[in-house]
Amino acid sequence: MLILSRKTNQKILIGDDIEITIIDIRGDQVKIGVDAPPSVKVFREEIYQEIQNENRAALVRDTELNLPELHIKKK
């Protein structure tokens, strides 16, 4: 893990198209801004974990469905 020290308004660049800016530092909280292309998904860790848990739960629900056999009518 790379560990960096930054001050307010300083930036960290990731690759060619992701920019992290330190917006504010107050006590033990750091406010950051993330500038990334729309194709890059950016989540807080707790939100990402919630999404993963919901996806797993949906997968289990979908596999438990007992759908009747579907018949396709031929024209």
From Swiss-Prot:
Keywords: Bacterial flagellum biogenesis, Cytoplasm, Repressor, RNA-binding, Translation regulation. It comes from the Bacteria. One of its GO terms (cellular component) is cytosol. InterPro entries: CsrA, CsrA_sf. One of its GO terms (biological process) is regulation of carbohydrate metabolic process. It is found in: Cytoplasm. Pfam families: CsrA (PF02599). Its main location: cytoplasm. One of its GO terms (molecular function) is mRNA 5'-UTR binding. Homodimer; the beta-strands of each monomer intercalate to form a hydrophobic core, while the alpha-helices form wings that extend away from the core. A translational regulator that binds mRNA to regulate translation initiation and/or mRNA stability. Usually binds in the 5'-UTR at or near the Shine-Dalgarno sequence preventing ribosome-binding, thus repressing translation. Its main target seems to be the major flagellin gene, while its function is anatagonized by FliW. Belongs to the CsrA/RsmA family. This is Translational regulator CsrA. It comes from Treponema denticola (strain ATCC 35405 / DSM 14222 / CIP 103919 / JCM 8153 / KCTC 15104). The gene is csrA.
